[in-house]
Curated annotation (Swiss-Prot):
Coiled-coil segments: none
Organism: Lysinibacillus sphaericus (strain C3-41)
Protein name: Lactate utilization protein A
Entry-linked HAMAP family: LutA (MF_02105)
Domain of life, per lineage: Bacteria
One Pfam match: CCG
Gene transcribed to yield this protein: lutA
Similarity comment: family membership: Belongs to the LutA/YkgE family.
InterPro entries registered for this protein in UniProt: Cys_rich_dom, LutA
Length: 228
């Protein structure tokens, strides 16, 4: 997040601080290891995972603005099941890790963060976040309580945008057709904003929207909730 979309990370911090959370972002944290692991670099990815486990060992909660990364954290215990020490540490990390909107709604018990944004918005439900983490209602509740924002459901909302991490590289033609279909559905809503909760999906859809010159602003939900 700090490498590609720093504004999203900044928004996450500012929103949570307004909700009275004390934020710490350990300098030793790196990638969660998912791209390397999914590409077959198991040994290398485990080194990254161990570093992440250690970095967040003393945190009360770990919050991420990416359902994909959170799901990877949840997979750590299974990945380290042959190593009792690291499996135990991985299990502890997984238990306290939450997706950003999930944390706000289900842990902090807040559905209105006092955000304001004028316009019409639709929301893309990313695959890992909804299908694997089961985080479905939290982001919608938060968006519906943004003052001035009209929420419109996205047709075919349960369909993948075509990113899928390395899928978009390995299966470029198929990925391109999938994201084009998604952009078409976004246009059908007449939305001013396309909102999502996973950076990969937003980069994929945002790139296609930009190249086609569509008048639609792509935003991460953290940026929306940080609007005043």
């Amino acid at each position: 997040m700090d490498m590609f979309q720093g504004d999203i990370g900044k928004s996450v911090v500012e929103v949570l601080e307004r909700l009275c959370c004390e934020i710490d972002s350990p300098e030793q944290q790196i990638c969660c290891g998912q791209p390397a692991y999914n590409s077959g670099y198991v040994k290398e990815s485990k080194n990254a995972m161990k570093r992440m486990i250690t970095a967040f060992e003393h945190a009360d909660y770990v919050v991420s603005p990416s359902g994909s990364c959170v799901y990877m954290f949840k997979e750590y215990p299974e990945i380290f099941k042959g190593d009792p020490l690291w499996a135990s540490k991985a299990k502890a990390l997984a238990a306290k890790t939450y997706e950003f909107t999930e944390f706000i709604v289900h842990v902090l018990k807040i559905e209105d963060v006092g955000a304001h944004l004028e316009g019409k918005a639709t929301y893309h439900t990313s695959c890992h976040m909804t299908r694997l983490l089961g985080v479905n209602e939290a982001p919608i509740k938060l968006l519906q309580n943004v003052d001035g924002l009209q929420y419109v459901e996205l047709p075919g909302k349960d369909r993948c945008c075509g990113f899928g991490g390395t899928f978009s590289v390995k299966m470029g033609n198929i990925s391109g057709e999938m994201v084009q279909e998604k952009v078409h559905h976004v246009e059908e809503t007449g939305a001013d904003y396309l909102i999502g909760a996973d950076a990969g999906c937003l980069i994929n859809m945002g790139g296609r929207i930009h190249r086609q010159g569509k008048p639609i602003k792509v935003m991460h939900i953290a940026e929306v909730l940080n609007c005043r």
